[in-house]
A protein has these predicted regions:
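Conserved G1/Walker A P-loop phosphate-binding module
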Residues: 2-165
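C-terminal-of-GTPase-core extension/linker across diverse P-loop GTPases
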Residues: 13, 17-86, 91, 183-345
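Alpha-helical scaffold elements adjacent to nucleotide-binding pockets in ATP/GTP-utilizing enzyme cores
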Residues: 48, 99, 152, 170-177, ...
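Conserved Switch II/interswitch segment of TRAFAC-class P-loop GTPases
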Residues: 136-139, 151-195, 207-213, 237
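Short, well-structured alpha-helical interface segments that form or flank functional binding sites
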Residues: 148, 169, 286
Length: 345
């Protein structure tokens, strides 16, 4: 092994050696690949790690097949963020996906209808958010392939069914199933590179069900010190009949704020501004981060940027707007939602 690896890589390697299950080994190998310094001296090690990871995933897939499930097509990340829907069978994950996206998941009254991961794109205004439906989780039926997707996502929606008297037990079971596989569902991730900690939001679904209000109160009391809870209903008129309980149509806006997505628009120097699809980063992102999304060379070649923010940006974004005076900023300038950037190389 090369001697110039980081302490974080060495810790990940130690964790891999201590791993007992295939799930753990996959997670630890993914950590090692992420943390491995990239230079000529590590090329062979990088290739070896990738081979070992592929072999472990084949073993995991074979195991999943023996237990009646399979991963389906590989899910590529798209949009401003990727959020995975998890929960017990019948909780309403697929209904949420169907209502918010163009995806057409199979929905039925029998248990364990969903067999593969299925993506769909929800939208909050002009910000696309990828939702990924997943097979139900239960003791003895945690899909192996789900853990890698959850770890690599920007967040998890733990969907709970307010029509069930077993609601509180369902929540604790889900938390325990992930914890047993070294995935902690948390309100906030303390360390950016901690792949075992995944941000989670509890979606209390079926607020239109009889007795849902009382169960929602109990659920909130149970999870208050651990996770935030958002009420939801997929009933077509839920938002009109029970505005305090929330409609599924409100969920993309909730996710946009919860994920702290920032939209940035760009303007070509010397040309009239035309509003196009924004570039998206997360809160704390900088002008340099946006440059890298525009073109891989822009971040290094940028001399300065002109930035319209607040009322100046709003005026520029308005139809036939002229905009106010821009600021001149460097690549280190943090960006805010709604900023307009003009990049000068």
């Amino acid at each position: 092994m090369p001697t110039n690896v980081t302490p974080d890589y060495k810790r990940a390697e130690e964790a891999f050696r201590a791993a007992k299950t295939t799930d753990e080994k996959i997670a630890r190998l993914e950590d090692m690949i992420t943390l491995l310094p990239k230079h000529k001296g590590t090329d062979h090690l990088f290739a070896d790690l990738k081979r070992r990871l592929a072999k472990l995933k084949e073993e995991a897939e074979a195991g999943a097949g023996r237990h009646g499930g399979h991963a389906g097509p590989e899910i590529g990340r798209e949009g401003a963020a990727q959020v995975v829907l998890v929960g017990a069978t019948g909780a309403g994950k697929s209904s949420i996906l169907q209502r918010l996206t163009h995806a057409q998941p199979e929905i039925g009254d029998w248990p364990f209808v969903t067999r593969i991961l299925q993506p769909g794109m929800a939208h909050y205004e002009d910000a696309p958010i990828q939702l990924v439906d997943s097979p139900a989780i239960a003791p003895g039926t945690m899909p192996v392939h789900l853990l890698g997707v959850v770890r690599g996502s920007d967040g998890v929606l733990l969907v709970e069914d307010l029509s069930r008297d077993t609601l509180l037990d369902d929540f604790e079971t889900a938390m325990a199933l992930f914890a047993e596989r070294h995935v902690r569902l948390v309100r906030e991730r303390a360390e950016p590179h901690d792949r075992d900690a995944v941000r989670c939001l509890v979606v209390a679904n079926k607020t239109d069900a009889p007795g849902a209000a009382d169960r929602l109160t109990l659920l909130r009391e149970l999870v208050a010190d651990r996770l935030e809870t958002v009420p939801c209903s997929c009933a077509p008129d839920a938002g009109e009949r029970r505005p305090l309980n929330g409609s599924v149509a409100d969920l993309p806006g909730v996710l946009f704020r919860w994920l702290r997505i920032v939209r940035v628009y760009t303007r070509t120097p010397g040309q009239h501004f035309e509003r196009t699809k924004p570039f998206t980063v997360f809160e704390g992102g900088t002008v340099g981060d946006v440059c890298a999304l525009v073109h891989k060379d822009f971040a290094e070649r940028l001399r300065f940027a002109r930035l319209w923010r607040g009322p100046a940006a709003a005026a520029l974004l308005a139809p036939h707007g002229g905009g106010g005076e821009p600021l001149t900023v460097s690549r280190a300038e943090p960006v805010h939602d709604g900023d307009v950037l003009e990049l000068h190389l």
